A protein has these predicted regions:
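Divalent metal-coordination and catalytic microenvironments
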Residues: 9, 30, 48, 61, ...
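Metal-dependent amide/peptide-bond hydrolase catalytic core
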Residues: 32, 199-385
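Non-cysteine beta-strand/loop elements that form the S-adenosyl-L-methionine
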Residues: 62, 71, 174, 334-338
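Acidic/His- and Gly-rich active-site-bordering loop/insert found
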Residues: 1-87, 96-99, 103-111
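Active-site pocket-shaping loop/turn-to-helix segments
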Residues: 12, 189-195, 251-257
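Histidine/acidic-residue-rich, glycine-tolerant segments that coordinate divalent metal ions
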Residues: 46, 68-70, 74-86, 92-93, ...
């Protein structure tokens, strides 16, 4: 049944804050299993509530529901039927695993306390986790800790990976406009060339990473777009630098943002140009908490054995908006290995089975493993006296 749900969700992907069908399926299933449901938290989010015993302790288990704006090239039976939309990050599987756990917990209730089942919208850049928090997630559903999980291609099928402390990086965007003075390209002395100034700024910024930041603290500053000009014989009025900054600590991020602006302003002023400096902090670093990570490791080892749990995985510079929940509550986020793609049925797109790839598919062999982890985590965190 859970596999059928997963494949149905894969065939009907919905983008962030558009997960109406998905949320309806989730809520209907939970209610059919006798689980009270709150709908519409954070626009399309769903929270299920399973109580047992008399303890006031509570934990949250979170799964994301949204898809990506991509055209799937797989040709198997459960491929996307919605043009330009695809579950290329496995959120269909995340939703299904939490539903599987919900069904078991509702039937057996071998815990003392409350388990909140958090089905989150809009993880893919929409900030759905933050939106649910702003909509009262932790006030309306008070919990002691919150947990998340993500499938991870390249890690052996059915193995877990986690690290105490920083697990994923912050995600930040900058958009910096250099304003000069346009001129004929044959008479550059009559203008102020914003392209030349922008290039100087871009080169200087990289010294923040190589010469100003502590080399033991990881960070990335990538310029991914440069926009300027419209003709070969015109020096434009402005040039724009766009890109991303990733860090594992806010202290390093503070340094980078401050020095980027100082360098941009100073270099531009030296050439008679000006700068409009835009820097947006999107997702904070995802940092696991020690006590909850220990609970998670205990639960993972109980499900797959100690040899299949890597507790020293290398953090990734990718970002996750579950970080907002871990800022508000203690908790832990883990990776569950999706394998190398051998699980895909015939008719797949022949490309790599990587996240955000048009040939990706979630590994259904993970469904019982992920669901069992959620169950074990609930029973470990909320033991019956």
């Amino acid at each position: 049944e859970i596999q059928a749900i997963r494949r149905d969700l894969h065939a009907h992907p919905e983008l962030g804050y558009e997960e109406h069908r998905t949320a309806q399926i989730v809520a209907d299933r939970l209610e059919a299993w006798g689980i009270p449901v709150v709908r519409g938290l954070g626009v399309t989010g769903v929270v299920g509530i399973i109580k047992n015993g008399t303890s006031e302790r509570a934990i949250g288990l979170r799964a994301d529901m949204d898809a990506l704006p991509m055209q799937e090239i797989n040709g198997f039976a459960h491929a996307s039927t919605n043009a330009g939309k695809m579950h290329a990050c496995g959120h269909d599987g995340h939703t299904a695993m939490l539903l599987g756990a919900a069904h078991y917990l509702a039937q057996h209730r071998n815990f003392d306390g409350t388990v909140y089942l958090i089905f989150q919208p809009a993880e893919e850049g929409g900030g759905g986790g933050e939106r649910m928090i702003e909509d009262g997630l932790f006030e309306r559903f008070p919990m002691d800790a919150v947990y998340g999980m993500h499938n991870w291609p390249g890690i052996a099928e059915g193995t877990f990976a986690v690290v105490d402390g920083p697990m994923m990086a912050s995600s930040n965007e900058f958009r910096v406009t250099v304003r000069g003075k346009g001129a004929h390209a044959a008479q550059p002395h009559r203008g102020i060339d914003p392209i030349m100034v922008a290039v100087q700024i871009a080169q200087a910024w990289q010294t923040i990473i190589s010469r100003e930041k502590n080399p033991l603290l990881t960070a990335v500053l990538s310029i991914t777009q440069i926009h300027a000009g419209s003709a070969t014989n015109i020096i434009p009025d402005e040039a724009q630098l766009v890109g991303t900054v990733r860090t594992f600590t806010t202290e390093v991020l503070d340094l980078i943002e401050r020095r980027m602006q100082e360098m941009a302003d100073g270099i531009a002023a030296g050439f008679g140009a000006t700068v409009d400096f835009g820097f947006k902090r999107k997702y904070p670093p995802l940092v696991n908490h020690t006590e909850q990570t220990a609970f998670a490791i205990e639960a993972m080892r109980a499900v797959v054995g100690p040899d299949a749990v890597n507790t020293n995985v290398e953090p990734t510079m990718g970002a996750e908006d579950f970080a907002f929940m871990l800022q508000a509550k203690p908790g832990c986020y883990v990776f569950l290995g999706n394998g190398d793609g051998d699980h895909r049925t015939g008719g797949h797109g022949l490309g790599p089975c990587q996240l955000h790839n048009a040939s990706y598919d979630f590994n259904d062999n993970l469904l019982p493993i992920g669901a069992s982890y959620w169950v074990r985590l609930a029973e470990t965190s909320l033991p019956v006296a």
